[in-house]
Swiss-Prot record:
Originating species: Rhodopseudomonas palustris (strain BisB5)
Gene Ontology MF: a single term: glycerol kinase activity
Reaction it catalyzes: glycerol + ATP = sn-glycerol 3-phosphate + ADP + H(+)
NCBIfam families named in the record: glycerol_kin (TIGR01311), PRK00047.1 (NF000756)
Protein name: Glycerol kinase
Length: 500
């Protein structure tokens, strides 16, 4: 039985997982790498750290499984989206550290684009809003701030890519410069309706077309790994951004299905099918996947801080040693206190989209302590998800056609406390799958589909298995009171920005 290898390149670590033909996991390896914060709101990675951690985890997973290159039918890549690398076409050397999706350095550029009236045109073409989150203004910043970069780019000497594209380039020995439609759709440079790079957007952001990769289906033969990397060539057969890969891994192939992934941030996607749906509630319209040249679209809500808020409790405040301690600590909180954390550590994402505000605690008293902070931190993830859920239900024209269910995945879903509170606040069932590695599974499925190892999407969906369903247990009065308190906290934070 052949293996399929998934590369899951994330914000804080790189992982490789070998899946069997029955989608069970044969072996995995993970390696963290450093984050760099050179200025307030700036987040960077060393491209070599990303590459070296990816390569070493692939080799480690293969060794654990006793797998040779000839035993692997294909590699699927999934990646932190929007993060950008620009490198020399000949040497392969990056001209600067990778600028990470969380980075806010281009906030002023985005403000000017909005003030000049460009946002409606950009949104019409890309489905995105103008925000530092996306790749386009990051590329422009690199070209304008790295000495000589713009001239080199205009002479065709530089290449641009999101992390999937950079890894593909490195894996292929510098022979393949390509990406897939899901990653391209996150750049502010790609027209999601035509499926092509858009000349008007490229001109606006002054990004030379020669820098851009070829855009392919999410399940396709992108190229082959260099022989010397794994002692034999392996076909690279699938690519998708991490949230789209999780949507696939959760088997959300039917329009109306919603998944939410909890990692560093939180990202919810609602499959809208073959037609893009324009949001009236500041959600993004994006490509969910592209198979056989046909695009499926999604509404997406992006939250910048979820699991990283728990890391803050551990690393910043030192009130826990392990993430697993957060739920039991939250259980000890004083029920008479109503403490709200709005974790806008790098601004607020959907549906508020304010890059300037910063995090705040509301409702603290003299008796507020570690338990209340843990409680507020976990609840903040649930409240933010509620905001996305409500916006999606309002935007989706067929929202009342089927009972709402949220499929969840990611590290935070191991917390029963958080998942139960999420179901309570949504007033809807929350389904946690047996296979938690849904992002990697989605990448593996795309590669396995191309290689003929895995079946067509609907047959794959039949193999999805439920671990636990969390059902709402909170009274309507309590739910409404808590949601109203959250609304006041967010309003107060946004008002602080308006007052500056």
């Amino acid at each position: 039985m052949p293996f399929v290898m998934a590369i899951d390149q994330g914000t804080t670590s790189s992982r490789a997982i070998l899946f069997r033909g029955d989608i069970s996991i044969a072996a995995s390896a993970q390696q963290e790498f450093p984050q760099h914060f050179p200025a307030s709101g700036w987040v960077e990675h060393e491209p070599e750290d990303i590459w070296n951690s990816t390569l070493s985890t692939c080799r480690a997973a293969m060794e654990k499984a006793g797998a040779r290159a000839s035993d692997i039918a294909g590699i699927g890549i999934t990646n932190q989206r929007e993060t950008v690398v620009v490198w020399d076409r000949v040497s392969g050397q990056a001209i600067h550290r990778a600028i990470v999706w969380q980075d806010r350095r281009t906030a002023d550029v985005c403000t000017r684009l909005k003030a000049d009236g460009y946002e409606p045109m950009i949104t019409d073409k890309t489905g995105l809003i103008v925000d530092p989150y996306f790749s386009g203004t990051k590329v422009a910043w690199l070209l304008d701030n790295v000495p000589g970069a713009r001239g080199r780019a205009e002479r065709g000497e530089l290449m641009f890519g999101t992390i999937d594209c950079y890894l593909l380039w490195r894996l292929s020995g510098g022979t393949v410069h390509a990406t897939d439609a899901t990653n391209a759709s996150r750049t502010l440079l790609f027209n999601i309706h035509t499926g092509e790079w858009d000349d008007e957007l490229l001109k606006l952001l002054r990004v030379p077309r020669s820098m851009l990769p070829e855009v392919k289906d999410s399940s396709a033969h992108f190229g082959d790994s260099a022989y010397e990397l794994f002692g034999g060539s392996i076909a690279i057969r699938g690519i998708a951004g991490d949230q789209q890969a999780a949507t696939i891994g959760q088997a959300c192939f039917t329009p109306g299905m919603i998944k939410s992934t909890y990692g560093t941030g939180c990202f919810a996607l609602l499959n809208t099918g073959a037609k893009p749906v324009r949001s009236n509630n500041k959600l993004l319209t994006t490509i969910a996947y592209q198979l056989d040249g046909k695009r499926s679209y999604a509404l997406e809500g992006s939250i910048f801080v979820a699991g990283s808020a728990v890391q803050w409790l551990r690393d910043g405040l030192g009130i826990i040693k392990h993430a697993s301690e957060t739920g039991p600590l939250a259980d000890k909180s004083d029920s008479m206190q109503s403490v709200y954390l709005v974790p806008a550590f790098v601004g607020l994402g959907a549906p508020y989209w304010n890059p300037r505000v910063r995090g705040a605690l509301f409702g603290m008293t003299r008796n507020t302590g570690p338990a209340e902070l843990a409680h507020a931190t976990l609840e903040s993830v649930c409240y933010q998800t509620y905001d996305l859920w409500a916006a999606m239900r309002a935007d989706w024209p067929d929202a009342d056609a089927a009972p709402p269910v949220l499929r969840v995945d990611g590290g935070m879903t191991a917390s029963d406390w958080t998942m139960q509170r999420l179901a309570d606040l949504l007033d809807a069932p929350v389904d946690r799958p047996v296979i938690q590695e849904t992002t990697a599974l989605g990448a593996a499925y795309l590669a396995g589909l191309s290689a003929g190892v895995y079946p067509e999407p609907q047959k794959f969906a039949d193999n999805w298995r439920l671990d636990r369903r969390f059902k709402p247990a909170m009274s309507a009065a309590t739910r409404e009171r808590k949601l109203a308190g959250w609304g006041r906290a967010v309003k107060g934070l946004l008002a602080s920005d308006e007052g500056e």
